[in-house]
Amino acid sequence: MMSWADKYRPKNIDDVILNSEIRKQITEWIESWKEGIPKKRSLILYGSQGTGKTTTAYAIAGTFGVPVVEMNASDQRNRDSMRGTALMASLYGDLFVESAKRPSKVILIDEADNMFERGGDTGGIYELSKIIKNSANPIVITMNDIFEFRKKNYASDVISASLTIEMKQYGRKLDKNYNEFRRNIKARLIFILKNEGYTLPDQVVDRIIDRNMPDIRSMINDLEASAVSGTNISDQSSRDVPEIVYYMVDKAFKRNYDDTLRSIYGSDIDDSYYVSWIDENLPLKTVDLQDLVSAYEVISYADHILWAMERRRHYELMAFPMEIAGGVAYYIENMKHEYVKYQSPSYISQMSKTKEKRHAMMSLALKIGLLIHMGAQRTSEDLWFYSLLYQHNEKLRTFFEEKLNLTQGEENVLTRSE
């Protein structure tokens, strides 16, 4: 059972809700590839979250009729691979085949403004500029803050080689673009309702739009929740996440899978958060040990898919972990039917208690990483070693204190103090 947001995701650029000026620029860029390799081989889409940058990139690929090869620039493994043009070529085959008659793929560089935040680490941006210069395939680069990206070395080379479009659908409310954008959104929502066999009052649809503007995916999620459940989601002043997930967990344990799926698709709850809630409350709902073992096997499978999504970037698996975890009640033969007060995942309260310490560890890793020209992730793995040196080598301790401007929390990490 696919969510409405996924079911009605734009397949090509004509399906994307854009103002006329943005649509014209993107369409002209797509058309320029039909005449050979254009001067501007890459397209930069920038703007706040929820404005459809990534959706537009996939719609562009759909218009070309080719797949997307996605690299998330904020991911450390992909940042490192960006440094080597030869490695990119080996990974993506005909990326540099100038003789290609038409594009064979769209290269998506997502969240490029998060690329190489460490000072002086600009090799990847330089390599990206070379890739743009030589690519035989369209490249779409998304970023939230182009002005922050401009400050990085070689960023100007990337920007000058690209067509740059701000994904801002309107300047202010009630201007021409705002009215056009709103009309198009409302028409799309009404079309979805009609296609799914539901109706909602006009004022409810209007409130859903106003509540989520300009995030279309959230609008469709609220539309589905309101239509299917018969409740007016738009009347809620804010999404009370603990209350919503409590309701969703209760649905999962009542063995009505259709209701469970509706609660999942009608929410913005993160997959891992939902799975964690189910996992935490299994002992409260099971009587027999064997039932608990069977239920944990289901959660283990959902957890494995979460790992594949987060570590291997298999985002096509999104929603599967929730769908799997949501069916766990069918593996519990003897379930407690009396009232149970569901518990928030224990790791969340533990994370809250250790928040300051974790923040100190990360800031210390960043400082040491800058000093020794190493990534924060790798440095954080070696903090135990720097802690030993700090405690037993007076010269290094003095050096760290002079160079790192340590906070009390960072010093506590190095001295292993609580």
Swiss-Prot record:
Q: Which residues bind ATP?
A: G47, S48, Q49, G50, T51, G52, K53, T54
Q: Which CDD domains match?
A: AAA, HLD_clamp_RFC
| Any single biological process term in GO | DNA replication
Keyword terms, alphabetized: ATP-binding, DNA replication, Nucleotide-binding
InterPro entries (alphabetical): AAA+_ATPase, ATPase_AAA_core, P-loop_NTPase, Rep_factor-C_lsu, RFC_lid
Q: How does it assemble?
A: Heteromultimer composed of small subunits (RfcS) and large subunits (RfcL).
Query: Which family does the UniProt entry place this protein in?
Result: Belongs to the activator 1 small subunits family. RfcL subfamily.
Stated name of the protein: Replication factor C large subunit
- Please tell me the species this chain comes from: Thermoplasma acidophilum (strain ATCC 25905 / DSM 1728 / JCM 9062 / NBRC 15155 / AMRC-C165)
Q: Which gene encodes it?
A: rfcL
